[in-house]
Amino acid sequence: MTRLPLGSSSIDIAGPTTNWWDQINESVQWQDGIFYSLCASYALVSAVALIQLIRIELRVPEYGWTTQKVFHLMNFVVNGVRAIVFGFHKQVFLFHPKVLSLAILDLPGLLFFSTFTLLVLFWAEIYHQARSLPTDKLRISYISINGAIYFIQACIWVYLWSNDNSTVEFIGKIFIAVVSFIAALGFLLYGGRLFLMLRRFPIESKGRRKKLHEVGSVTAICFTCFLISCFVVVLSAFDPDASLDVLDHPVLNLIYYLLVEILPSALVLYILRKLPPKRVSAQYHPIS
């Protein structure tokens, strides 16, 4: 009785399905197409943030640099830098020493952290004011935490510049993951608190419902994106096949940056698109 070569047929079937990922990753055309698409996406989000900043400034120029204006300015900068990085991806991923490539890829991520934790600071101030709690130390805490993060990361880069050590590079990735986890906790803590406080507010109004939707949506989006970032960075620290710092992982880069930065930025900018009300002149008195 003749035996059928089941092993070879299963390999023939599995081969095309397992190789398409490698074929895309190793294709220069696919690499260029994906990274230039990321460049265009970041440039679009950056332009939207700049347009919104200009609209706010034209609407209320007398308010100075409010949290809302700073948030949109930082969004413009972060997404603009990412667009430039991916526009010159061939040079960025192949920099020598390697620490230059790591720094250029990681710095926008730290700026993204600073940009979105600005919302956490804003919500914390609102929550503390509503609870009659002191707010004077909140901004100091925000600046101190960000300053400490940039200082530690700079020390890691300087060490890698002088001594390209795989252990220190591993520590650097874990540090970035911890930073993302801190941001996720910040949104869960203060976004969640503010959301629950608004839900318990006794007076029902259209403004309350809008603010409830705004806080809930932004909290869910930002908590999710920072948690995904934490998970992927930890995974890449232990598994080289999940690394984001190489040219031949374009599909992984596309999925990661879409989920972690581009879509969250676009959605939050859309949710926070409402312009602040114009200041009523002191000389104007409405007809009663």
Swiss-Prot record:
Topological domain spans for side Extracellular: 1-33, 97-101, 161-169, 239-250
A single GO BP: viral replication complex formation and maintenance
Location within or outside the cell: Vacuole membrane
Cytoplasmic side: 55-75, 123-139, 191-217, 272-288
Alphabetical UniProt keywords: Glycoprotein, Host-virus interaction, Membrane, Transmembrane, Transmembrane helix, Vacuole
Top-level taxon in the UniProt lineage: Eukaryota
Membrane association type: Multi-pass membrane protein
Transmembrane segments: 34-54, 76-96, 102-122, 140-160, 170-190, 218-238, 251-271
Knockout mutant characteristics: Reduced efficiency of intracellular multiplication of tobamoviruses (e.g. TMV-L, ToMV, PMMoV, and TMGMV), characterized by a reduced accumulation of viral coat protein (CP) and reduced amplification of TMV-related RNAs.
Any single GO CC term annotated in Swiss-Prot or TrEMBL for this entry: plant-type vacuole membrane
Residues listed as glycosylation sites in the UniProt record: 25, 165
Biotechnology comment: TOM1 inhibition via RNA interference constitutes a useful method for generating tobamovirus-resistant plants.
Cited Pfam families: THH1_TOM1-3_dom
Keyword check for Transmembrane helix: yes
Assigned protein family: Belongs to the plant tobamovirus multiplication TOM1 protein family.
Task performed by this protein: Necessary for the efficient intracellular multiplication of tobamoviruses, probably being a membrane anchor promoting the formation of the replication complex.
Oligomeric and partner information: Constituent of tobamovirus replication complex. Interacts with TOM2A and with the helicase domain of tobamovirus-encoded replication proteins.
The name this protein goes by in its record: Tobamovirus multiplication protein 1
